[in-house]
């Protein structure tokens, strides 16, 4: 893309949550690559956090953006969930939904789909309330800091979740590798990292504005996770991609990894 890498200042000034949600999360039943990507992530998360899956007390979601779908599956398994994002607007959008404020984004279709995966599409309202109760805080995050949640200091978590965010925050493979190490510092030994990464994505559109990414290969992501001190328990490489006019990625990688117990 033209110009330099779009860093935090550009996100703070120009990233509009409603444009982003309209582009990537209009889950209205009509078929689209974006809807299929959302389904893919919800299915992976259901398998990861559903019956017999990961559970614990605390989960930190890094780079939540203005979305809540990524913690729908986990709210039955974790009682203390932290959402986080770099930009004020995204955090405000999250708070609107959590507090049921007028004009909050309607996540009902995604919540209903998540409940269908659990075999009970009728309990979607209960699911929303369970999630609202489980989310204890919405914090600012910066994955380039040694403590990505600074100045907040939280107890080490059982799980760190980050979907479709790290590749947008990092300008290079080295920056991505360093950021993964920062995320690892938030986890207990033996805790889990759960992440979806869009592959070979140079940039993506939000409204009429283009935001840059680091274009990662599956092997680079895999090695970065290993080098950050994790053992990979699951790696799913899918050809799932967005509409080329929105985000010209080439597949995605879903990973569940366990932080090594220590030296």
Swiss-Prot record:
- Record has Cytoplasm as a keyword: yes
Q: Which residues bind S-adenosyl-L-methionine?
A: 20, 25, 63, 69, 85-87, 90, 142-143, 163
**What are the GO cellular component annotations?**
cytosol
Identify the PROSITE patterns for this entry: NNMT_PNMT_TEMT, SAM_MT_NNMT_PNMT_TEMT
Query: Catalytic activity, per the record?
Result: a tertiary amine + S-adenosyl-L-methionine = a methylated tertiary amine + S-adenosyl-L-homocysteine + H(+); a secondary amine + S-adenosyl-L-methionine = a methylated secondary amine + S-adenosyl-L-homocysteine + H(+); a primary amine + S-adenosyl-L-methionine = a methylated primary amine + S-adenosyl-L-homocysteine + H(+); dimethyl sulfide + S-adenosyl-L-methionine = trimethylsulfonium + S-adenosyl-L-homocysteine
- What broad class describes the main subcellular location of this protein? cytoplasm
User: What GO biological process term is on the record, naming one?
Assistant: response to toxic substance
Q: In which tissues is it expressed?
A: Widely expressed. The highest levels were in thyroid, adrenal gland, adult and fetal lung. Intermediate levels in heart, placenta, skeletal muscle, testis, small intestine, pancreas, stomach, spinal cord, lymph node and trachea. Very low levels in adult and fetal kidney and liver, in adult spleen, thymus, ovary, colon and bone marrow. Not expressed in peripheral blood leukocytes and brain.
The GO terms this record gives for MF are: amine N-methyltransferase activity; N-methyltransferase activity; thioether S-methyltransferase activity
Q: What is its EC number?
A: 2.1.1.49, 2.1.1.96
User: What Pfam families does the record point to?
Assistant: NNMT_PNMT_TEMT
Query: What domain of life does the UniProt record list for this protein's source?
Result: Eukaryota
**Sorted UniProt keywords:** Cytoplasm, Detoxification, Methyltransferase, S-adenosyl-L-methionine, Transferase
**Class of enzymatic activity (EC top level):** transferase
- Quote the subunit structure annotation: Monomer.
**What NCBIfam families does UniProt report for this protein, alphabetically?**
GntF_guanitoxin
Q: Which family does it belong to?
A: Belongs to the class I-like SAM-binding methyltransferase superfamily. NNMT/PNMT/TEMT family.
Q: What is this protein called?
A: Indolethylamine N-methyltransferase
């Amino acid at each position: 893309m033209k110009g330099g890498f779009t860093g935090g200042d550009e996100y703070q000034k120009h990233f509009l949550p409603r444009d982003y949600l309209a582009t990537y999360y209009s889950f209205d039943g009509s078929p689209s690559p974006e809807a299929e990507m959302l389904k893919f992530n919800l299915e992976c998360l259901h398998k990861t956090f559903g019956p017999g899956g990961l559970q614990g007390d605390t989960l930190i979601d890094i780079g939540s953006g203005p979305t809540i779908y990524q913690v729908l599956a986990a709210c039955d398994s974790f009682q203390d969930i932290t959402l986080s994002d770099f930009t004020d607007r995204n955090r405000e959008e999250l708070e609107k939904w959590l507090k049921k404020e007028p004009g909050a984004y309607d996540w009902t279709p995604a919540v209903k789909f998540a409940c269908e995966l659990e075999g009970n599409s009728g309990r979607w309202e209960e699911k929303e309330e369970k999630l609202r109760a489980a989310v204890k805080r919405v914090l600012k995050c910066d994955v380039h800091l040694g403590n990505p949640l600074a100045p907040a200091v939280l107890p080490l978590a059982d799980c760190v979740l980050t979907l479709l965010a790290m590749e947008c925050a990092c300008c290079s493979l080295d920056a991505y590798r360093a950021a993964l190490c920062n995320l690892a510092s938030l986890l207990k030994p033996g805790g889990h990292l759960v992440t979806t990464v869009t592959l070979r994505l140079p940039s993506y559109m939000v409204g009429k504005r283009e935001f840059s990414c680091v274009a990662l290969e599956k092997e680079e992501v895999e090695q970065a996770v290993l080098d950050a001190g994790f053992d990979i328990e699951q790696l799913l490489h899918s050809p799932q991609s967005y509409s080329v006019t929105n985000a010209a990625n080439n597949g995605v990688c879903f990973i569940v990894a366990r932080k090594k117990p220590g030296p």
